[in-house]
């Protein structure tokens, strides 16, 4: 699932910058 999240990261940021901020901390912790 982590792989899918990382691939969708760029799409989320481009679609919703607000969501990217929320996912940023989550990604940093997951990585």
Swiss-Prot record:
Matching entries from InterPro entries are given as: Amanitin/phalloidin (IPR027582)
Q: Which residues form the propeptide?
A: 1-10, 18-31
A Gene Ontology molecular function term for this protein is: toxin activity
- Supply the alphabetized keyword list: Thioether bond, Toxin
For this chain, the Swiss-Prot or TrEMBL PTM comment says:
Processed by the macrocyclase-peptidase enzyme POPB to yield a toxic cyclic heptapeptide. POPB first removes 10 residues from the N-terminus. Conformational trapping of the remaining peptide forces the enzyme to release this intermediate rather than proceed to macrocyclization. The enzyme rebinds the remaining peptide in a different conformation and catalyzes macrocyclization of the N-terminal 7 residues.
Placement of covalent cross-link 2'-cysteinyl-6'-hydroxytryptophan sulfoxide (Trp-Cys): 12-16
In the UniProt record, does the keyword Ribosomal protein occur? no
Top-rank taxon of the source lineage equals Eukaryota
Where are the residues linked by the Cyclopeptide (Ala-Pro) cross-link? 11-17
Similarity comment = Belongs to the MSDIN fungal toxin family.
Q: What does this protein do?
A: Major toxin that belongs to the bicyclic heptapeptides called phallotoxins. Although structurally related to amatoxins, phallotoxins have a different mode of action, which is the stabilization of F-actin. Phallotoxins are poisonous when administered parenterally, but not orally because of poor absorption.
Against NCBIfam families, the record matches this protein to: amanitin (TIGR04309)
Q: What is this protein called?
A: Phalloidin proprotein
The root-end lineage is: Eukaryota, Fungi, Dikarya, Basidiomycota, Agaricomycotina
